[in-house]
C-alpha cells in the first residue's frame, strides 16, 4: 500500500484486484506484443495523479476519422502519419484503469495493430503520451451489422 493512498483508492485497488485484474491483464496481453504482468501496471495513486493532469476534450481534438474496423493497414497508416511521435513513451488505458492502473509502454510499436474486435470488451483503447502532449483514442463499435473504428487524436 502506498502511504498516500486514500481509503477510496484502496477500496478500488482491492476490488479491482479481485474482480477485474485477471481479465484486464488478459486483454492487455491480447492487445500488446509484449507480456504484461500486474507489477508492470502503475499504482492506483499514480494512475489517478496522471489522469487528473490530462485535459484533452473536444476543443483539443486534432484529427478524427471513421474507418472500417477490418482495415488495420489504414488504421496504422493514419496513426503513423498524424501522431507527433510514434516512438514516444505512452500510457495505455482500458476500461478498468481506475481499478487496475495504467500501463506504461515504450512506444506504439508494441501494440498489436491487428487486434480483434473482442480483444477489448468495452470497445475503447486509449494511448496517452507520458509527457501528456498527445492522446490517441481508438473507439470501435458495431452498427447495422458492420464494424467501425473511430480514430481520434487530441
Stretches found by the model and what they are:
Residues 1-143, 151-154:
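Structured alpha/beta or helical-core interaction and ligand-binding surfaces enriched in interleaved
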Amino acid at each position: 500500500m502506498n502511504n498516500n493512498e486514500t481509503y477510496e483508492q484502496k477500496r478500488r485497488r482491492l476490488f479491482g484486484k479481485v474482480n477485474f485484474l485477471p481479465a484486464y491483464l488478459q486483454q492487455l496481453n491480447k492487445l500488446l506484443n509484449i507480456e504484461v504482468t500486474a507489477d508492470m501496471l502503475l499504482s492506483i495513486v499514480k494512475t489517478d495523479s496522471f489522469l487528473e493532469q490530462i485535459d484533452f476534450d473536444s476543443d483539443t481534438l486534432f484529427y478524427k476519422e471513421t474507418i472500417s474496423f477490418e482495415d488495420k493497414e489504414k488504421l496504422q497508416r493514419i496513426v503513423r502519419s498524424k501522431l507527433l511521435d510514434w516512438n514516444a513513451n505512452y500510457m495505455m488505458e482500458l476500461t478498468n484503469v481506475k481499478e487496475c492502473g495504467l500501463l506504461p509502454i515504450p512506444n506504439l510499436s508494441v501494440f498489436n495493430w491487428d487486434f480483434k474486435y473482442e480483444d477489448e470488451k468495452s470497445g475503447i483503447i486509449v494511448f496517452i503520451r507520458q509527457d501528456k502532449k498527445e492522446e490517441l483514442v481508438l473507439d470501435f463499435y458495431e452498427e447495422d451489422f458492420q464494424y467501425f473504428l473511430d480514430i481520434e487524436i487530441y
